[in-house]
Design a protein with these regions (language model features):
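Conserved cytochrome P450 K-helix E-x-x-R motif and the immediately C-terminal K′/meander segment
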Residues: 61-82, 362-414
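Cytochrome P450 heme-binding "Cys pocket" and the immediately downstream C-terminal segment
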Residues: 340-342, 460, 477-529
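Short, small-residue alpha-helix embedded
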Residues: 324-337, 487
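Conserved cytochrome P450 K-helix/beta-meander segment immediately N-terminal to the heme-binding cysteine loop
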Residues: 427-455
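Hydrophobic, well-ordered secondary-structure elements that form the walls
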Residues: 346, 389, 422, 446, ...
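N-terminal membrane-proximal hinge/A-helix region immediately C-terminal to the signal-anchor transmembrane segment
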Residues: 2-137, 141, 146-150, 165, ...
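Cytochrome P450 heme-thiolate monooxygenase catalytic core
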Residues: 120-132, 166-329, 345, 350, ...
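C-terminal helix/juxtamembrane-tail motif
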Residues: 2-6, 529-553
Length: 553
C-alpha cells in the first residue's frame, strides 16, 4: 500500500531484524524445532512439512508490486485474516525457527513491559549482536539485564527535557545549512535526493548531541573522519552476504574491511571520550554537555568496560539517531503535500505562534530566545502531525526471544494463553497502529486531528508504539520529535512539497490537482514501503514557495 519514500537502508534493516536474524541464527541455535507444541497458535494457513509457511509467503508477495516490504505484505494478509492478535510463521527451510508476529496492542505490551521474570522486559533476540559493527556490541541497542540498566542510567541525563531544550540552538544552527541547500535547489530547479539533505542534517545534529563533534555532513569535502568511516563501514556491512554461514564470511575481503573500519571507528570515538573525561576530572569548564560527556560525570576512573560501553553507545546513537529523524521528516513532507487541510492548519498554527512572517530566519530568531520552550509547547497541531506520521510510518521494530524453559506466557484478548518459549517475538507497529478496532475506517488515512480534542483519550497509549514501549523504548525519541518540530516550524511556510513518480499527485485537464472524497489530493498510484533500500530523487523549482518534488524510479 504505502512505499516508504526515500527509505534508507538502516530503517529497512531495523524493520527486518527478525528476518535477517534468522539467516545468521545458527550462531545461537541449531537442531529441529518441535512444531507440534505450537499447532494451536494462529497461523496464516496450514504449514507445509518441508517448506513451512514459505508457500504462503511467496503467494502473498506475488500479489502486488514485488518491491513492497514484508511489513506491507503482512499487513495485506492480516486484513484478509481478520486481524488476528498474533500470527505464527514457520520460517523453514530458511531456518528451523518460528516467528510470532504480535499484531495486538495488549499482547505487545506483555512483550515489552517489565516482569518479575524479566526486569528489563523479554530479552532482545541474539541476532541483534550481528548489528554490532553499526550499533556496538555493548550499547543500549544490544545489551540486556543489569548491564543495560546501568548504562541507561548513565545516559539518561543527556535526554532530560530541560537539556533537550538547550539543544534547540544546535538544531537551528544545523537547519540553517539545510534550508540554504533547499533554497539553492529552488533557484536552480534541479532534481535531487531529499534523503541526502535530511540525513545529513540529522547526522550533523546527532554528532553534536552525542559527542559534541562537528560531523560536517552538510558540507561537501569537509566531512569528519567519524562520518566518513561510519559511512564506509555501513556500505561494507550492507555488502555482507548474510546467506552465508558466519564462519564462511569471516575470511572474505569484505569481512576484513568491516573489522578494520570497526576498529578504526572505535579508536576515534574512544580518543574523543578520553579527552572529555580528562576535562571533567580536572574541572575544565570547556567540557561539553554532550550525551557521552554527561554520562561520564561522577566516574573517577574510565575503566575499559565503561570506555567500551560509551564508545558503543555513541555508535548506536549515530546509527539510530540520524535515520529515524530523516525518515520522519520525509514522510511528514509527503503527507503534507497531499493533505491541503493539514498543511493549512499547520501554517495557521505557525502564523499564530510566530507571527505572519514565513521567513525561516524570523522563526529562528524567536526560537533562539529564552521562551523557546513555551513556543514549542504551543505547537499542538505540529505535534499531532508528527504523531500521525509516526503512526502510519513507524521507523523500526523490536525482536525478542523468550528463553527455552522460561515458561514465558502471553495472554490473548480472548483469554487464551500461549507459552512462547523459543519463539522470536516481534510486535509489528505498522499493523498495531492501523488496528480498525481503534482507528476505524480512517486507519490508513493521515488525520492529525485524531490526536487532538476529547477523542484522543479513546486511543489506548499502547496503540502508538513507533519507538516501541516499556523500559527499552527508544531513548532519543523526544530528541527526534523535537528536531522535526523545529524543522517544520522553519520551513512549512517556505516550501511546498509535491511527489512525482510513484505516489505522484494527479491533475485534471487544466493541470489542477484533484481532491478526493476524503479531502486529499488524488494520486496516480499508491505509495508503499519498499523491501529493499532504494534511493529516490527530488526536485525543487522556484516560486513564491519552493516546490519540492519526490521522484521515484
Amino acid at each position: 500500500m504505502l512505499e516508504l519514500l526515500l527509505l534508507h537502508w538502516p530503517t529497512v534493516l531495523l524493520a527486518a531484524i527478525p528476518l535477517i536474524g534468522l539467516l545468521i541464527s545458527r550462531n545461537w541455535k541449531s537442531g529441529d524445532v518441535d512444531f507440534k507444541q505450537y499447532a494451536h497458535f494462529p497461523q496464516p494457513e496450514e504449514r507445509d512439512e518441508k517448506r513451512g509457511h514459505w508457500p504462503w509467503i511467496e503467494k502473498s508477495a506475488a500479489v502486488g508490486d514485488p518491491r513492497r516490504s514484508f511489513d506491507i505484505i503482512l499487513y495485506e494478509q492480516v486484513q484478509k485474516l481478520g486481524f488476528p492478535p498474533v500470527l505464527l510463521v514457520d520460517w523453514r527451510p530458511m531456518e528451523p525457527l518460528l516467528i510470532l508476529f504480535i499484531l495486538d496492542n495488549t499482547v505487545a505490551e506483555q512483550v515489552t513491559k517489565t516482569s518479575k521474570q524479566f526486569s528489563t522486559s523479554i530479552p532482545k533476540h541474539p541476532a541483534m549482536q550481528d548489528l554490532a559493527p553499526l550499533v556496538g556490541s555493548r550499547s543500549l541497542v544490544t545489551l540486556d539485564g543489569d548491564e543495560w540498566k546501568g548504562l541507561r542510567k548513565r545516559i539518561l541525563p543527556g535526554f532530560q527535557p530541560q537539556h533537550l531544550l538547550s539543544l534547540v540552538k544546535v538544531i537551528l544552527d544545523k537547519s540553517k545549512l539545510f534550508i540554504e541547500h533547499l533554497e539553492k535547489r529552488a533557484e536552480l530547479g534541479e532534481e535531487f535526493r531529499v534523503d541526502e539533505l535530511t540525513t545529513n542534517l540529522a547526522f550533523d545534529v546527532i554528532g553534536i548531541v552525542t559527542f559534541d563533534m562537528e560531523l560536517n555532513a552538510q558540507i561537501p569535502g569537509k566531512q569528519s573522519p567519524v562520518l566518513l568511516t561510519y559511512r564506509e563501514l555501513s556500505h561494507a556491512y550492507i555488502a555482507r552476504d548474510v546467506t552465508k554461514h558466519w564462519l564462511r564470511r569471516y575470511f572474505t575481503e569484505n569481512e576484513r574491511k568491516i573489522r578494520r573500519l570497526d576498529k578504526k571507528l572505535d579508536v576515534i570515538l574512544k580518543e574523543n571520550i578520553q579527552k572529555e573525561h580528562a576535562k571533567i576530572i580536572r574541572g575544565d569548564a570547556t567540557a561539553s554537555r554532550s550525551v557521552a560527556t554527561l554520562s561520564l560525570h561522577g566516574i573517577e576512573k574510565l575503566t575499559p568496560e565503561i570506555l567500551q560501553q560509551t564508545s558503543d553507545t555513541c555508535r548506536g546513537f549515530l546509527f539510530a539517531g540520524h535515520d529515524t529523524t530523516s525518515i520522519l521528516m520525509q514522510w511528514a513532507f509527503y503527507e503534507l503535500s497531499r493533505s491541503p487541510s493539514a498543511l493549512k492548519a499547520l501554517r495557521d498554527e505557525l502564523d499564530e505562534v510566530f507571527g505572519p512572517d514565513p521567513n525561516p530566519s524570523a522563526v529562528t530568531k524567536q526560537l533562539l530566545g529564552p521562551g523557546n520552550g513555551d513556543l514549542l509547547n504551543r505547537l499542538k497541531y505540529t505535534d499531532a502531525i508528527i504523531k500521525e506520521t509516526l503512526r502510519l510510518y513507524p521507523p523500526g521494530t523490536t525482536a525478542r526471544l523468550a528463553p527455552q524453559g522460561s515458561g514465558t506466557t502471553l495472554t490473548l484478548p480472548n483469554g487464551e494463553k500461549l507459552v512462547v518459549d523459543g519463539l522470536v517475538l516481534t510486535p509489528r507497529a505498522l499493523i498495531i497502529q492501523r488496528d480498525p478496532k481503534i482507528f476505524g475506517e480512517t486507519k490508513d488515512d493521515f488525520v492529525p486531528e485524531r490526536w487532538l480534542g476529547p477523542e484522543a483519550a479513546n486511543i489506548p497509549e499502547s496503540c502508538w508504539r513507533p519507538y516501541e514501549r516499556g523500559p527499552r523504548r527508544c531513548t532519543g525519541s523526544e530528541l527526534a520529535n523535537m528536531e522535526v518540530k523545529v524543522v517544520l516550524a522553519c520551513i512549512a511556510r517556505r516550501f511546498d512539497w509535491v511527489k512525482v513518480g510513484l505516489g505522484e499527485l494527479d491533475a485534471d485537464e487544466n493541470g489542477q490537482r484533484i481532491l478526493n472524497e476524503k479531502g486529499y489530493y488524488k494520486t496516480k498510484s499508491e505509495i508503499f514501503t519498499v523491501g529493499l533500500s532504494k534511493m529516490r530523487s527530488c526536485r525543487l523549482s522556484g516560486s513564491i514557495h519552493a516546490n519540492l518534488f519526490f521522484l521515484s524510479d
